[in-house]
Each structure stands twice: as C-alpha cells, then as structure tokens.
Regions:
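Short N-terminal binding/cap micro-motifs at the start of the first secondary-structure element
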Residues: 2-4
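Secondary-structure junction/capping motif
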Residues: 6, 54-58, 115-121
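Active-site phosphate/pyrophosphate- and oxyanion-stabilizing loops and adjacent acidic/basic residues
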Residues: 9
Length: 159
C-alpha cells in the first residue's frame, strides 16, 4: 500500500533485516515473478495470512525452528486477498493465521473482518512467539503515536 501512514514504514524503522516489495495484484505473471525472485534464496518461507487452509498459532509455534523467512501481505483486506489469490506461489507456501483475542488498535483503518490486524500488529503477534523477552508495547509505540497523530487530524464534531 502506498498510503503515507502505512504501518510497513514503521516496520522498516524497527526491524532488520526486512525485505519489502511493492506488488501489483492486477498482473498475476509479474506478481509471481517478483515473488519468486524475492523468495528464491529461502528454503522454507512461512506466510502469515488467514486463508481457508491456514494453520493456527499452535502449528506456527511448532514450526518456529523450521523456517527461514516470514511473509506478510500488507494492504487492505481486499487487496491482500487479491494478491494471495493471484499468486500461485503464495498459495503454495505453508500459511498460518494469528488467533487474536483483542481487536486491532488501529481504529481508523476499516476492515470487513472483526478481528483483523494491521501489518505491524500481525508482525508483533508473531514476534511474541519467538522471544519471551519481546516487548510488544515498546515495538508498537511508534504505531500508537501514528494513530494519535491520525486521530488529531480528524476534524472534531461540533456539539
């Protein structure tokens, strides 16, 4: 997504190494070529995506030692689904969904799914599985600041 408040921009500041590719879901051949080129150096990338055949968080925890890359699709739910369904390569990856108990903090973002997460929130949920010492509040602090800025930009309703 190319929105100035895109949460992937915050990820670039917080994570290293991170590889971000901009995909056009309207051209399946180009989409697959870019994904193939990006993932060719990895032997067992895992996709974090709530597809119909995605495994749950417990299965993800059991796979933590066997993967060498995590793949997240950033964008609106409509765009993310389109990228997933246009890419035969992404559909072949082992995919996992994150079972969450709380709604997203990103209230400004609209989603048709009740318990959908922004990309940075999904990354944070997965990182919590890796490291017992992972401080998700510290990791998400720039995201919380971004939300605060966005809320301040919304015109106040007159009473």
């Amino acid at each position: 997504a190319k929105h100035p408040f895109n949460t992937v921009n915050i990820l670039k500041l917080n994570l290293s190494p991170i590889n971000i590719i901009d995909l056009n879901p309207d051209n399946a051949e180009t989409l697959n070529n870019v994904i193939n080129e990006t993932l060719k150096e990895y032997h067992n990338p895992l996709l974090i995506f709530p597809g119909d055949n995605s495994l749950n968080k417990k299965a993800l925890v059991n796979s933590l030692d066997s993967f060498d890359a995590l793949v997240f699709i950033d964008g609106t739910w409509k765009k993310s689904k389109k990228i997933f369904f246009q890419s035969s390569l992404l559909q072949k990856l082992n995919s996992y969904k994150i079972d969450i108990e709380n709604k997203s903090t990103y209230e400004i973002r609209k989603s048709s799914l009740e318990y959908s997460l922004s990309t940075i929130e999904a990354v944070s949920e997965v990182l919590k599985l890796f490291e017992t010492s992972f401080n998700d509040q510290e990791f998400l602090n720039p995201f919380f600041k971004m939300i605060e800025i966005q809320k301040n930009l919304i015109p106040k309703k007159r009473e």
